[in-house]
Amino acid sequence: MNQNIGIIIDPLDSLHPEKDSSLAMIWEAMNRGYDVIAFYPENIFLKNGMPSATGILLKKNLKSLIKISERSLWEGSLKELDLLFMRKDPPFDMEYIYLTYFMDALENLGVRCINPGSSLRNVNEKYYISNFPNCIPPTLISSSVVQINKFIAQYKKVVLKPLDGMGGKSIFVINKDDPNRNVILETLLGDKRTIMAQKYLPEIKDGDKRILIINGNPIDFMLKRIPSKDDFRGNLVRGARAKIIGIGNEERRLCEKIRPHIIKHQLMFVGLDVIGNFITEINVTSPTGIREIESAKNINITKILFDEIESS
């Protein structure tokens, strides 16, 4: 009997086959003979204490992966799974947290989850970098207008971002004398919302670096995302340009710094974001970059990932 792999994922027709890391994982699983079932968050439920769902049983015809017929529907208890990937993109809101509770229940039934639900809750992608004060730029996490204004006054130019977002959404660069400062703070803070402020790093003009880490070990190549001329954000969805380069000694040093935490939280797949020599985020929910690196270099990252999963 084939083993079943589940994947909690965004709508399949919203994914780009040539770029999407989740699809790369699905294809690798299929090539290894796994049955792969895709689940949308709204179709997962807990009934009488049993995590269950309706999903889409994906077929081996990879070209038709995005257009699935109703005949491929799957329904049942999630305890039938051997492995579950969580690949739902943020925002990391209460609905996301509820999904991690489902994952907890599954793990109690012996189903392995990547990454584990408890770790997704405990390792907030932005907040968690505060555990490495010597490896990050000057950083403030606060909901206080007073404290944030003091931080802006001290560092003159800062980056402001919510703790629960992704893809460069709602990220602002603000100067000490910016006439829109109050409006930006009102927009971000809302009703005492906690945000992150970081000293602006001019190295972002040369690009930020996404380092993929599998079970604590970095991949030898990293994705450099160079912002467009009219945008400071190093996000491909915001127009940044991709460049694949070899990982350097400084990046390896940063990976070694966070490695014990990765192992402690059983984080099989992580995306580390670096600007200059500073960590800016530790992505654990749905790291991307596989397709860009694989298309440029002779490396099969999903094979490395599944080899590690199957041997650990």
PLM feature segments, named:
Residues Q3, L15-E18, G246-S312:
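ATP-dependent carboxylate activation and anion-phosphoryl transfer catalytic cores
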Residues P11, K88-P91, L163-G165, P287:
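Short glycine-rich anion-binding loops that position phosphate/pyrophosphate groups of nucleotides
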Residues I9-E18, Y34, I226-D231, V237-R238, ...:
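Charge-biased, low-complexity intrinsically disordered regions
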Residues V146, A153-K157, G167-L254:
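Phosphate-binding site of ATP-dependent enzymes
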Residues D13-I141:
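Conserved N-proximal alpha/beta basic substrate-recognition cap immediately N-terminal to
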Residues I7, F85-M86, Q198:
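Redox-cofactor binding/interface segments in oxidoreductases and associated redox assembly factors
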